[in-house]
Amino acid sequence: MGKFTVTLLVFLMVLPLIVLPARDEEHDEKDKRSAAQAIPRYSSKPGESLIDLMARNQKSSGNEACQDSDCDKDCGDCFCGYFKPTCSCHCLDMIPL
């Protein structure tokens, strides 16, 4: 290979390191904080089932808690959808745990 080709290859390999600005740690921390605030985090209490945790989170988000009487008789227990704005009923054996 000629001198020009080698120089061009080296330049193209080094160019992204020069052009791309380095992200500082303060900027990364700011991104992590804003991401953590955007996603609500809920922790379960000792001995609390997943269904109870989701129902409690649904109540704490301002949505009305679902009632078993709202459920279809064939469906079974009421289950508050974690990512849904309203409560809905699901068959408990269909919920992947």
Swiss-Prot record:
Keywords: Disulfide bond, Secreted, Signal, Toxin. Residues 1-21 form the signal peptide. One of its GO terms (cellular component) is extracellular region. Expressed by the venom duct. It is found in: Secreted. Belongs to the teretoxin J (TJ) superfamily. This is Teretoxin Tan22.5. It comes from Terebra anilis (Auger snail).
